[in-house]
């Protein structure tokens, strides 16, 4: 699996995501750069994740981040197509100190740019800009699509140690149902694809923990499932096997982790979260689905 390039870069590795050109900044902590972490942006509404870094690649942390979007392949690439305010994602985990998310809709394919104005406290505002591409269609299940009715391994086929790399293992309720079984129930479903022990972005464990906390509040009204990215995590933890991606991950055509999907009671994708999504952000979408 390919971890979110922006986080790998923020932690000292990685070269950026395909089609993305990082802001060229001098190696100065007083400057700023931004990186787009999403690998599957397409026409229509999207949740976008950005790494907000100083000039030497360290996370700037919680800041007021305002974004402007430009369609560089459009008739007038200088026209601002939309403006949004980004949301800081790092209050719950140190691994997400660089990360901010926003909701934005794209009306054309091709090359786009995002410009960030970053202000922390009373300090001087910093600006940074980067480019990314928008596809016609998402490669992975998108909002409005029917969720794949995957028949994944569960506690009926395997002990929990083979179903998750989380140690100690967490709530067994996350491993009792297949996705197909959960979709047959008349209630929503949250599916977390993550590998807590082997995540390149260091946010898979916190992502699963966020879902487990939400299950304590909403587990009587909806289903929760965790899909470990790799087969036999018990043997991977002791270096006895090479990593093999689970069939469920291939079913959903995922290329990054963590990836979280919220499915409504009709079996359609109501929301999706590439990369880390804190519990409060997930909860907003859950509340909307439960109220619909």
Model-derived features with residue positions:
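Typically the conserved alpha-helix immediately C-terminal to a functionally engaged Cys/Sec
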Residues: 201-218
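Thiol-/selenol-based redox modules, centered on thioredoxin-like
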Residues: 140-141, 148-159, 269-292
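Residue-level recognition of beta-strand->loop/alpha-helix junctions
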Residues: 194, 226-228
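Thioredoxin-like thiol-disulfide oxidoreductase module
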Residues: 219, 229-257, 262-269, 287-291
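Bacterial signal peptide processing site
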Residues: 12-15
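Short active-site neighborhood of thiol/selenol oxidoreductases, capturing the structured segment around
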Residues: 159-162, 171, 179-200
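Contiguous segments within soluble domain cores/interaction surfaces
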Residues: 18-163
